[in-house]
Each structure stands twice: as C-alpha cells, then as structure tokens.
Swiss-Prot record:
Keyword RNA-binding applies: yes
Signal sequence, start to end: none
NCBIfam families in the record: rplN_bact
Cysteines joined through disulfide linkages: none
Keyword terms: Ribonucleoprotein, Ribosomal protein, RNA-binding, rRNA-binding
GO cellular component: a single term: cytosolic large ribosomal subunit
Pfam families for the chain: Ribosomal_L14
Name of the protein: Large ribosomal subunit protein uL14
GO terms under biological process: translation
SMART domains the UniProt entry points to: Ribosomal_L14 (SM01374)
The organism's taxonomic lineage, starting at the top: Bacteria, Pseudomonadati, Thermodesulfobacteriota, Desulfobacteria, Desulfobacterales
Length: 122
C-alpha cells in the first residue's frame, strides 16, 4: 500500500535511486496504490549524468510492495521493499533493464514490456 509522501526504491536503470510519491492516480480521493498502479513521483536521489535528474516529476508503476497482495487462488505474495519503475507517457519504461523480481499482477495490468524485461516474475 503506497500513499502520498511514500518513498520508493527505483527498480530500473533510468538513473533515479529514490522517488517520492506525489499523487496516486485513478480517482479524485484515491488514497492507496498497490502493485500495478500508476503514481506520480518526484526524483529525490539520482546518479550523475543520467536520463533523470533530482527534482524531475514523472509517472511510475509500482512493481513490489511490502504489504501483501492477495491472489484469486487464496495465496499471498509480499516483497522486502517498496519499488517502482519509471514510465513514459505511453506506459513504456524509461530504463532498459529491470532489477529484481516483479509481481505477476503487472501482466494483467498490460505492462508487458516491464514483465518481459524483468529477470523473474513471481
């Protein structure tokens, strides 16, 4: 469960390290976002000479959350960290690599490029 002001790690090689959630997209009073949801973020930490700079405002899709996700078969999945992948306006990732596993829920939300780049889909 990601809400406004949550800090997340970045799971791609776009150059950002830490991002800060500004807004959860999808409804005027939507409070929480989970895996597969799109949020608006601000870059808080970035490596030098990268595609993104500190202070940039971008969209990101959540790929891992500490809060468990219930699956339709009754099982749960949770990760050790909250992570996101930065995306462009047409839902394509800004980076060319994804680090760490991603949840299977991204496939249902039509983020096929992120699923194909990920080393593992859980």
């Amino acid at each position: 469960m990601i809400q406004t002001e949550t800090r997340l790690k970045v799971a791609d090689n776009s150059g950002a390290k830490i991002v800060y959630c500004i807004k959860v997209l999808g409804g005027s009073r939507r409070r929480y976002a989970t895996v597969g949801d799109v949020i608006v973020v601000s870059v808080k930490e970035a490596i030098p000479n990268s595609k993104v700079k500190k202070g940039d405002v971008l969209k990101a899709v959540i790929v891992r959350t500490k809060k468990e996700i219930k699956r339709p078969d009754g099982s749960y999945i949770r990760f050790d960290e909250n992570s996101a992948v930065l995306i462009s306006g047409n839902n394509e990732p800004l980076g060319t690599r994804i680090f760490g596993p991603v949840a299977r829920e991204l496939r249902a939300k039509r983020f096929m490029k992120i699923v194909s780049l990920a080393p593992e889909v859980l």
